[in-house]
Amino acid sequence: MTTHLDNMNSRKKQNWETPIDQFMEWCSRLGLSPAIDVCATKANTKCAKYFDKRSNGLKKQWTESWFMNPPYNEVAVWIRYAWNQFKEYGQDGLILVFNKTDTKWYHEFVWDQSKLKNRPNVETYPQSGRITFLENGTLPENPAPYGSVWIVFSKTKLRERLLRQCGL
């Protein structure tokens, strides 16, 4: 679940959904199989298990591999919590957020971490073009007004994950 700014009138909208084809493509491409969607609704979850607003993923332990497309007005809070959960439990995480490399959270939890030696693996994959997120299961007229980036927190590198996915 996420909030995007509407292209036409800058109103904030809730409950935008990651298109399932995008989610599946990136999971396959990155060798990931998230077990839990940590900020979703029953209608838009991408995983068999999910935390919704009522169960509050920010108060849960993420002891399984996870996916998140957080509310855009709360990205910093969710990224910080995701990083802490990753450090504590070491489960692979896949994150879809807006591609704004000038933000404090991006530098603190993505860019700075990727430069550290002996660090957990942090990978970024900018999305080509703009994603057209679903609204209540249907495509709106316009895509998101900015680009997106897929971020991976993992203890294993991409090559190792892909080999594992192939049973090697």
List the predicted regions and their residue ranges.
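Class I S-adenosyl-L-methionine-dependent methyltransferase catalytic core
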Residues: M1-L168
